[in-house]
Amino acid sequence: MRHRKSGRQLNRNASHRKAMFKNMANSLFLYKTIRTTLPKAKELRRVVEPLITKAKIDSVANRRNAFSKLRDSAIVAKLFTELAPFYKDRPGGYIRILKAGFRTGDKAAMAIVQLIDLETMTDTTAGTTTS
């Protein structure tokens, strides 16, 4: 019986799941929107939201913790310098999961995962680069 076992297995072993969610989180922070299956998107929320919450407090320990999860120093720097200050007044719910129909090959439920307030984030960053 699987009482009190949280999280989805997704037909993968633990190391594969860890690597997959690391790559998906890196892609989400880099491109601000990704397309994946619905169960993976719902699990990705459990990985990404605590990272953004920790990044709001910029300390060496929090940066090392984020680096241990993401393993990419450029993405960690972007998380702490761009994304975390943008969400500093938001208490949670940093990503949006939109249902995007079904995949053609196997009819798997697809979803679009994007960072909340994406439009205003791109407008503010575009405005600062042109000024």
UniProtKB/Swiss-Prot annotation:
HAMAP family: Ribosomal_bL17
The gene coding this protein: rplQ
Protein name, as recorded: Large ribosomal subunit protein bL17
GO MF annotations, alphabetized: structural constituent of ribosome
NCBIfam families the UniProt entry points to: L17 (TIGR00059)
SUPFAM superfamilies, alphabetized: Prokaryotic ribosomal protein L17
GO aspect biological process, one term: translation
Family, as annotated: Belongs to the bacterial ribosomal protein bL17 family.
Native organism: Vesicomyosocius okutanii subsp. Calyptogena okutanii (strain HA)
Coiled coil: none
